[in-house]
Amino acid sequence: MTTLPNRWRIALAGVVMQVALGAIYAWSVFRIPLTQAYGWSIAEVTLAVTIAIFVVGVAAFGGGLWMQRAGPRRVALAAGALYGLGVFLASFAGGRLWLLYCSYGLIGGVGLGLGYIVPVTTLVKWFPDRRGMITGIAVTGFGCGALITAPIATRLIAQVGALNTFAILGVVYLIAVMGAACFMQNPPDGYHPPGWTPSAAQQQQRSAKTYTLKEATATWQWYGLWALLFLNTTAGIAVISQAGPMAQKSRGSRLLPRPAWSE
């Protein structure tokens, strides 16, 4: 009899992965240092994270198809390598804005898109009895990425500069995501947690029709969900690009201390 891994260990690894990936929400703390150091406009700097988020949608789509064939671990390992590498290569941007776009925006965005879908998709399979709870935990981990990263990045920028901070964080992200990826695996077919018996409604949900891509895109619901996600993401990016400077300029802010370069 095959011994199954502890599902809570997989959940912890998933949260670690999401926290590292969610660090993209801390982008705004780089905005002022980059504009001051290289004379770039706010719009030019913000475009880097805009590219990353745009690429996320495409990469997540491809990653979902790949994960169906190869499993979550390979996808997560690739995500960690690309995400960490993209952020690390941003440290070589200097005055070359195009390199920032290609590294942080394109390469990092692909890694982020591949990685984001892995924990949520994997954990709901291990926690059919607590689908809502485990999804909330995973998504919360992503949201906490900025809460954890922003003050750390702010202090690093003040001490070693924005580019060196990219290098440090890139290595940390690579180790965190690829390390967590080693724990990602699907449960066996028909898996039920010990002592759990699905209700009639849950059994009906688990046996619901699975749509192919062609079938899904033939429904209005698919386009409605896409539009909803697009609007949600657009609003989020608008806030992300301004959150750090707003917090740094607000009196009494405790989340983001006022760094030396803002004085």
What kind of region is each of these model predictions?
Residues 142-189:
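Helix-loop-helix hairpin linking two adjacent transmembrane segments in secondary transporters
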Residues 18-19, 86, 97-113, 230:
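Hydrophobic core of transmembrane alpha-helices in multi-pass small-molecule transporters
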Residues 59-72:
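Helix-to-loop junctions at the C-terminal end of transmembrane segments
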Residues 25, 53-61, 146-147:
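Residue-level signature of mid-helix packing/kink "hotspots" within the transmembrane helices
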Residues 2-13, 96, 210-228:
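Juxtamembrane cytosolic amphipathic helices that cap and anchor the N-termini
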